[in-house]
Amino acid sequence: MLHTGCNLHEYIVGDKFIKHTDLAKGFEDRRYNLGIQLNDNYEGGNYVCWDDNNNEIIISKEVGTAVAYNARIPHEIQEITNGSRWSIVMPISSLEIIETKTLL
């Protein structure tokens, strides 16, 4: 796996990111994301994702919560109603996997 950079995200009152996946044009090689919650002193702004049965999952807002997820999973950030939401997101792209064998 290859780490391809970190992004610092700030969402302020009124901001949101509608339901989407991270496989948009230009990001086809992205396989996973790692998100880390940096603060919890805001309202709204739930990080929501959906499982294969379309069940909604709301991720904890606790500071330090880390979520690793497949880039194909639909997710969103709901509207911020008070304060600012800060997080770091690290996309991870795949490299060609090379089979190795241990020689004894």
Language-model features, listed with the residues they occupy:
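Catalytic core of non-heme Fe(II) oxygenases with the double-stranded beta-helix
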Residues: M1-L104
